[in-house]
Amino acid sequence: FSAFVFKIQANMNKAHRDRIAFMRICSGEFEAGMNVYHVQGGKEIRLSQPQQMMASERKMITKAYGGDIIGVFDPGIFSIGDTLTTSKEKFAYEGIPTFAPEHFARVRQVDTMKRKQFVKGINQIAQEGAIQIFQEYNTGMEEIIVGVVGVLQFDVLKYRLNNEYNVEIRLENLPYEYIRWIENEDVDMDHLSGTSDMKKIKDLKDRPLLLFAHEWSIRMTEERNKGLILSEFGRS
């Protein structure tokens, strides 16, 4: 048996604050309650209460087969692109490409007393793949930068944080239009030579990235740092 997680949805039932991980079965047969190895988590887990969904209806299932899509309760351990398997030879499916956001904003909660709800909410929404969140290099979660493909996603973020987590936010638009993932594993961010319109950031997995306001800055940064490999797409 093998499967990969392609979608996560939080608060499908607001009364229970549930979180469902949707996975596609790639091979073998699934049985409710079976134990599988979560490759990215590095441990064996039990998949209980599997469901299939049609619109707002949920149906508990006992078996599923290759090609089927099932939803399982996620206590916060899954991420998009995760592999689950019963194979003795551990492997991982290639991650799902992450499209480069084109709009960026610094996000803060209006009520400082709701910091915990804010961090929880924005992390859960990011784990669904609806937005991407970043931190400035060498800072903590105090400064959060959100990246989206379309500006309407900022409105969706505002609504969901307010409606689902009771958190009001303030957005400060940033001038950056381009983002690049750094492929080099041994890059020294402190000594990376860039341009005045470049910002060093990191994602939730502490992977280094660069933001640019102008396209020419990307080429100049590559020229100033021989061997630097920049990618327009990341992987979940």
Sequence positions of predicted segments:
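Conserved nucleotide-binding/hydrolysis modules and their immediate coupling elements
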Residues: 1-105, 119-120, 138-139, 143-145, ...
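Intrinsically disordered or highly flexible coil/loop and linker segments, enriched in small
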Residues: 14-15, 131-132, 170, 218
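A common structural junction motif
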Residues: 41-44, 88-93, 125-130, 161-170
